[in-house]
Amino acid sequence: MSNLKQKDSKPEVAVTKSVKTYKKSIEYVNSDASDIEEDINRAEDEYASSSGFVNFLRDFKKRYGEYYSNNEIRRAAETRWNEMSFRHRCQYSAEPLDTFHVEPNSVSSLQRSSEGEHRMHSEISGCADTFFGAGGSNSCTPRKENKCSKPRVRKSCPKPRAKTSKQRRSCGKPKPKGARPRKACPRPRKKMECGKAKAKPRCLKPKSSKPKCSM
């Protein structure tokens, strides 16, 4: 009977241990989830106006909160934030210059991304952005400053040209080749002066019809 009692008592101890460990794991998960929620809420309250990641995390939580747990949604938001470009991140910040100046104790997920983001912010004047599909590269060369150039001379207004009236061609028959051009104004003809009246010829005397005597 003693052996049977000992055998019966062993599984009871195992069951109680498993129940205790299960309760502890549930309490640990709940405490971890509650701590994450408290950290997020505290960060949202303190850095809602300055931190762009907190605003992005709030938006990401509203959209995809049903598909992720509290621990997974922070990691998913962090990976998505690291893939975003600088201009896209500035859309979630009220002050774009202070996007990367977030205290390390506010949100633990910003520790890895803050270093690269701060370097991008210091070299933003010469870096190529991938927001519009441009090729991104780690090596950024600063832009060359433009030298002092000569002032451009403004173009003066063009002088008005004299309008020439073009002669319109008439729809007449084409002139034959080699035709003499007509003078525009013909010369006036000289008027003939009135001449003196010619003298009439005198009437000759009639010859005598009588024959002369021959000797």
Curated annotation (Swiss-Prot):
GO terms classed as biological process: sperm DNA condensation
Source taxon at top rank: Eukaryota
Membrane-spanning segments: none
UniProt feature, compositional bias: Basic residues: 149-190, 197-215
GO cellular component: a single term: nucleus
Stretches the record annotates as Disordered: 140-215
Function statement: Not known. Encoded in the intron of cAMP-dependent protein kinase regulatory chain type I.
Protein name: Histone-like protein 18C
Organism in which the protein naturally occurs: Drosophila melanogaster (Fruit fly)
